[in-house]
Amino acid sequence: IIPKQSGIKVSGHNRSDDLFMFIRKKITGLSPGTQYQLYFEVEMASNVPTNALGVGGAPGESVHLKAGASAKEPVVARDNQNYYRINLDKGNQSVGGADLINIGNIGVTDTTTAYTLIQRSNPTPFSQRTGAEGELWIIIGTDSGFEGLTTLYYSAIKITLQK
C-alpha cells in the first residue's frame, strides 16, 4: 500500500474517547464475488510507551490498530447524532467488527520516548468477499480510547490474499 522509501503520517487529537483514524486503498483485478483470506503485516513508527497513564485510557494500550477489507468503499458521513462515522463495521476500540479486526496496539515499550518502528500482524486469517467486479478496499486504522494527541507514521503495509 505504501510506496518504497516513504510513509504516511496520521495524527489526531481525541477529545471524545472515540477517535478512528484510517487509510484506505482500493485493490482491483481479484476474482469477482470470491471469498479471500487476508493476512496483514503493518509496520509503523510510534513514540508511545506501554504501561503509561492517560485520560480515557493508556496512550499505548488504548489505541488499537485495526486492519480489514470491504467490497464497499469506506467513507465517512455524519450520523443522526451529528457525529462523523465510517460506513463499515469496525467494532469498537479493542473489539473488532465484521469489516476490521484488532491486530494490536501502538505501544512500544515502557521506556519509549523516541519514534520506534513496531510491527503488528494477524496470526489467523481475516475473511472477506470481493465485490461484483473483483474489487476490495483495504483499510488500516487506529481506534482510540486515549483522550489526547496521537501521531503515527505508517512505513510499510503488506497484505497477503488467499482464495
Language-model features, listed with the residues they occupy:
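A short beta-strand element within beta-rich, extracytoplasmic domains
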Residues: 34-51, 140-142
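Short beta-strand-plus-loop segments that form exposed binding edges in beta-rich domains
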Residues: 102-124, 138-149
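Proprotein-processing/basic-patch segments
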Residues: 134-163
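Beta-strand-rich interaction/scaffold domains
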Residues: 64-111
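Short beta-strands within extracellular/lumenal beta-sheet-rich domains
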Residues: 15-31, 117-125, 154
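Extended extracellular/luminal ectodomain segments enriched in beta-structured repeat modules
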Residues: 18, 29-39, 133
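Surface-exposed, low-complexity/disordered Ser/Thr/Gly/Pro/Asn-rich loops and linkers
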Residues: 1-22
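Extended, low-complexity, turn-rich repeat/linker tracts enriched in Gly/Pro/Ser/Thr and Asp/Glu
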Residues: 44-61, 73-74, 146-149
